[in-house]
Amino acid sequence: MMKRLQSAVIDRKPDLVIWQVGTNAVLRGLDPGETARLVQDGVARIQSAGSDIVLVDPQYSPRVNEKSEGAGKVMKLLGRVAELRKVGVFPRFEVMRDWHERQAIPVEEFIIADGLHMNDWGYACFAQLLGDDIIKSVCQIKLGVAVPSDVRTYRPM
C-alpha cells in the first residue's frame, strides 16, 4: 500500500488527497492496529509532501455491513488518526446509512449488484456532498465565510 501511495499519489505532488481507506481492511479482516499504523504513516507522508488530505471512511453497503464489527473498528481508528494528524474525515458510511434508514432509499438505488460499489447516482451524490464539505471547510478556514453547519441538509440530489 505504501509503495503505491508514493508512486500514485505523493510523487504527483497533489494539492489535495482524498483518501478512501478502510474498506479493504474490513473485507479482508485485517488487524485494526496494523491498519491504523499504515493509515497514520500514509497521512504523515502525504502531509510531509505538502498536500492537504481528507479521509473517506468505508461505504454503507451489504458486503461492508456483513462485517459490521470490523467496520466500526475501522471507522473509530480513522477518527483517531484524523484527530491526531488534524485532518478531516468525510463520514460516507453515515451519509449512506442515512439515505437508507432515514430517507428510506433502497440500497439497490445507490449500490450495484456486487453489494459493495456505488452506482452512478451514489457516486454523484457522494461527490456533491464531499465537494460541498470541502468548500465549507475552505471557506471557514481561509475566507471567514459563514456556511450552513451541515451542507448535507440543503444539498440533496
For every predicted segment, state its role.
Residues 1-157:
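Alpha-helical cap/lid subdomain in secreted, periplasmic
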